[in-house]
Amino acid sequence: MKKYTILGGLMAATATLVFSQPSAAPVKKGTVEKITVHGKSLEGNLEGDSPDRDVFVYLPPSYATAKNRRYPVVYLLHGYGLSGERWVPFINLLDASDKTVAEGTAKEMILVSPDAFTIYSGSMYSSSPTTGDWETFIAEDLVSYVDSHYRTVANRMSRGLAGHSMGGYGTVRIGMKRPDVFSSMYIMSACCLMNNPGAGRGGQAAAKQPPPDSAKANGKNNGKGGRFGNVQAADAAAWSPNPSNPPQFFDLPVKEGELQPSIAAKWVANSPLAMVDQYVTNLKKYHAIAGDCGLQDGLVGSNKDLDASFTRLGIAHTFETYEGDHTNHVKERFEGSVLPFFSNNLTFMSGKK
């Protein structure tokens, strides 16, 4: 009995110690706002997509109370077939951002994600009379709006650009042209790095696609994402637009089974691997460039080619491969790699990176 009594007392004491431990402090919460930003650069696009774009803005936990504090901004570009509304949970934007702040793996930043879903399920973040000038919308219209409506550190050293898949393509495409706006970029599993219509990602499938009917052109596509059937049409609208070819206003690189060399050349010219040599000086102005891609991702080869091109051209950067496919580790990469990367490389109010 004595032995039992001592054990019982020990258990009681242990229980008291366990239950008397202070509870972990709750994670401070940021917020995500859905706003509308008018894109002057998107006005008059021949697809008929609205120039008024949904934009999702993450404001960190201290934003509501630290009224004199300003924050760096990271612009996040979603992939093809997604809307901005679907992209936010796809990367776990709110919880991942709050968690990294709470754990100290990233400092507080404003995160901005525009909706680039179009009638063909994606803008390709390109400049075209058919789609509108998405390059200028991102780098000028959107940045100007955010700087004028939020407490940002409004200079290039405090702006980052990142994206996944089509958004990775947009990050490279816009980033290499606009070092005056951004100082750091993170390229996640970029698509479309070499566009060769004669080898796989071509126009034959698009040639079988009817142009959008008037209902779609008038905006009745609900914008929820997930429509991958129009990918070649989206490419053509972005890279081989033709205002003289209604109703779709683009040319396809394959016609009746035959490659159209002049059109195919336009697609190649819109490939970052073909463009990069033109923008070496711009890319060397970046404070930091990083990229990643899953080893089981069908795009890993072209992403490795971009890494090799940067190395050949003396462009400082890092590139990492990991076990995974195109989508199954995006949330983990966003939380564990993307947010810490920008936290370490952007300039905050103190002037420290």
Predicted regions and their residues:
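Bacterial N-terminal signal peptides that target proteins for export
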Residues: M1-G9
